[in-house]
Regions:
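Beta/alpha (TIM)-barrel catalytic core signal, keyed to glycine-rich beta->alpha loops juxtaposed to Asp/Glu
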Residues: 1-264
Length: 264
């Protein structure tokens, strides 16, 4: 969308109403260290030779930039979080932990699944717990922490919770006791496996953001180089001529405190 054409349309609409000035005053667009088209790509103005920020300054349009910390370097690369990623917890031997989970899941298929009625629709009871296989398949595809959190929160957790609750409701007697004893052994082992994958995903994200900081630091004042990557990314945007406001979603106290530092 051409900003200059939008301004022309606003002026035409105002003139059609007998008004001297239009009410088009604010533009919002994504911008971050990777997606800087508003600053560097001439695609609007006279002969399409001006950038969005240049036209915005000339026309008196306020520019709000969003996604300052969630970059999409390419269409296929997914989201790159421009923030530091502290490594939490101890490393997990994935192969060994996967074998432990696989053994428990095989025990479920032999001892518990046969007691469950198969409706013939949807997933068979024997396939309710196959995370050792699924996580082994998914592991090489994990791009980073943001990607892993999507997998964990949207695919793994909903399925596991739904199945756990359903079996706890429907099994009774000896079968229920057997299920509960197995569940109490299985859940901690599955969580350990998930924690190991989370750490691996964090390490992948950290490798990417470390390279970003290394490229960015020589361009920053020395006093800024010791700050977090998220602060550096926000400072760059907030200091860019033509950017009126940087919109940053802050879902925790730590996010707020980190972001407030750039206002000092």
């Amino acid at each position: 969308t051409s900003l200059s054409r939008m301004c022309d349309a606003a002026r035409a609409a105002a003139a059609a109403q007998g008004m001297d000035r239009h009410h088009f005053a604010v533009l919002q667009c994504p911008m971050n260290l990777y997606e800087a088209g508003a600053l560097v790509t001439p695609n609007t103005g006279v002969d399409q030779q001006e950038t969005v920020l240049e036209v915005a300054q000339r026309e008196g349009i306020a520019v709000l930039v969003n996604r300052p910390l969630n970059a999409m370097p390419t269409n296929k690369s997914g989201v790159l979080r421009l923030a530091d990623f502290p490594i939490e917890g101890d490393p997990v031997d994935f192969d060994q932990q996967c074998r432990t989970v696989a053994a428990l899941e095989e025990e479920y298929r032999k001892a518990i699944a046969p007691a469950l009625q198969d409706s013939g629709e949807g997933m068979a009871p024997a396939d309710f717990f196959t995370w050792a296989v699924e996580l082994t398949r998914v592991r090489p595809q994990i791009q980073g922490l943001e990607h892993w959190e999507q997998i964990e929160h949207q695919m793994i957790a909903p399925h596991v919770n739904q199945v756990m609750q359903a079996l706890s409701r429907h099994l009774t007697g000896t079968a229920a006791e057997q299920w509960e004893a197995w569940r109490d052994r299985y859940v901690p082992q599955l969580l350990t496996l998930l924690r190991g994958l989370r750490r691996e995903a964090t390490e992948r994200s950290r490798a990417k953001t470390t390279s970003v900081s290394a490229a960015l630091d020589p361009l920053l004042p020395e006093a800024r180089r010791r700050e977090s990557l998220s602060r550096k990314a926000l400072w760059v945007l907030a200091s860019t001529p033509g950017v009126t406001c940087v919109l940053n979603g802050m879902r925790s106290r730590d996010y707020v405190e980190d972001s407030l530092a750039i206002m000092g």
